[in-house]
Amino acid sequence: MNKVYDWFEERLEVQAIADDISSKYVPPHVNIFYCFGGLVLTCFLIQVATGFAMTFYYRPSVVDAFASVEYIMTSVNFGWLIRSIHRWSASMMVLMMVLHVFRVYLTGGFKKPRELTWVTGVTLSVVTVSFGVTGYSLPWDQVGFWACKIVTGVPAAVPIVGEPLVLILRGGESVGQSTLTRFYSAHTFVLPLAAAVLMLTHFLMIRKQGISGPL
């Protein structure tokens, strides 16, 4: 075992990396309320794992979507548990995100020199809510269909660009297969990729600047 470790140490300087991570200064005022951001990341990883598992059975079709979700819940081994964990962790992710934003705001963590960290965090909040909006409609039941119709119709109230935005979101004049395909693509590829990039940027900034001091 030591030989394996020494082999990696010689090439990657693993110990130096470990020392850098473990020796980072943590201010004495940090408490449990500073863990909300890490819990958001934990929920995101759970979402990725459970969501990936369901992609093997889910069919993004207006004809088959509901039946495929029903199949996951009733016929796939532990499918009901995987989908339930996905739903619960989604709700928990939104809750932890809201608490994290409030904690950062109330403790002044958005002030100079951490303005860009705050901007990436707020952008991540928008991405998190977008996860909920797109995922809610994927079962394509009555609730999902009408939620999709209402959400995609909201931009119509915006002058000039409203109607084109509605067409882009729906993929046509009305809600249908193109809309479901867009929501599925956004939920399983576009938003996870955006979240991963933003989280990495967010954490690197925190790593560089450290945790903000007390008020």
Curated annotation (Swiss-Prot):
Topology versus the membrane: Multi-pass membrane protein
Cofactors named for this entry: heme b; heme c
Annotated residues for binding of heme c: C35
Cell compartment(s), UniProt: Plastid, Chloroplast thylakoid membrane
Ranges that cross the membrane: 32-52, 90-110, 116-136, 186-206
UniProt xrefs under SUPFAM superfamilies: Transmembrane di-heme cytochromes
Quaternary context: The 4 large subunits of the cytochrome b6-f complex are cytochrome b6, subunit IV (17 kDa polypeptide, PetD), cytochrome f and the Rieske protein, while the 4 small subunits are PetG, PetL, PetM and PetN. The complex functions as a dimer.
Biological role: Component of the cytochrome b6-f complex, which mediates electron transfer between photosystem II (PSII) and photosystem I (PSI), cyclic electron flow around PSI, and state transitions.
Other known facts: Heme 1 (or BH or b566) is high-potential and absorbs at about 566 nm, and heme 2 (or BL or b562) is low-potential and absorbs at about 562 nm.
NCBIfam families xref list: PRK03735.1
Protein's recorded name: Cytochrome b6
